[in-house]
Amino acid sequence: MLTFPRIDPVAITLGPLQFRWYGLMYLFGFLSGWWLGRRRAAQPGSRWTGEMVDDMVTYVILGVVLGGRIGYILFYDLAYYLSNPTQIFSIWNGGMSFHGGLLGVVFAMWLLGRRNGLGFMDVSDFVAPLIPPGLFFGRIGNFINGELWGKHTTLPWGMVFPDGGPFPRHPSQLYECALEGVILFLALWVFSSRKRPTGHVSGLFALLYGVFRFTVEFVREPDVQLGYLAFGWLTMGQVLCLPLIMLGLWLLRPGGDKGTKAA
């Protein structure tokens, strides 16, 4: 059994101001996406400029924060927030939905494409490889908060989480860090380094993320307010991943978009 590192969720205190690790992880995620986007925009043949990447990050931040929070409220705990509306704005305590954030980013990419005369899939293919670092840092934030832990386990790397009872649990946040953060990033970055048919980079992102998240959900404790939705094992996270997997397969289908462009 591994010892859970008890890290103060407050990273920096400046007088009355407190900066939490959870919020800093989002900052690190946005900065990494900005840096990677700038690097890719500077490559020969890119249709993107540094200024477009700057605009993209602004749009994405709004999409992630607003979409992620609204998605969590609607998908996971609507009754609680209807009873406690003042908690809607307490995002520093956690409570963000990837799927809601993704919908927010999709809308942001549509707006960005319209502004710059780019097709939606052109924007999506450029942005997709920049997302996994944000997922990596986000799951680190979940781990520091001691939230979203997994089911009980006897495996040697099981951990006793502060609010997870006396028995070791899967550190499912770290599983997602590795799969959705590291492996997904490497796969997308390498895949998109060559010219691909329009939509294929986005399709690979949707497919791999959906498969990785669907798999980890089997060892992740379901949200207590929802539990299992069906069959004694199906979670809300898995339900929300099914459309992503199907979308990814459709975008990657043989004979799809014939246009070949650099991401």
From Swiss-Prot:
Annotated residues for binding of a 1,2-diacyl-sn-glycero-3-phospho-(1'-sn-glycerol): 139
Keyword field contains Transmembrane helix: yes
Transmembrane portions of the chain: 10-30, 56-76, 91-111, 117-137, 171-191, 199-219, 231-251
Main location: membrane
Origin: domain of life: Bacteria
Compartment list: Cell inner membrane
Keyword tags: Cell inner membrane, Cell membrane, Membrane, Transferase, Transmembrane, Transmembrane helix
GO BP annotations listed: lipoprotein biosynthetic process
Keyword Metal-binding: no
Enzyme class per UniProt: transferase
The enzyme's E.C. designation: 2.5.1.145
Biological role: Catalyzes the transfer of the diacylglyceryl group from phosphatidylglycerol to the sulfhydryl group of the N-terminal cysteine of a prolipoprotein, the first step in the formation of mature lipoproteins.
Annotated NCBIfam families: lgt (TIGR00544)
Name of the protein: Phosphatidylglycerol--prolipoprotein diacylglyceryl transferase
Organism: Nitratidesulfovibrio vulgaris (strain DP4)
Encoding gene (name): lgt
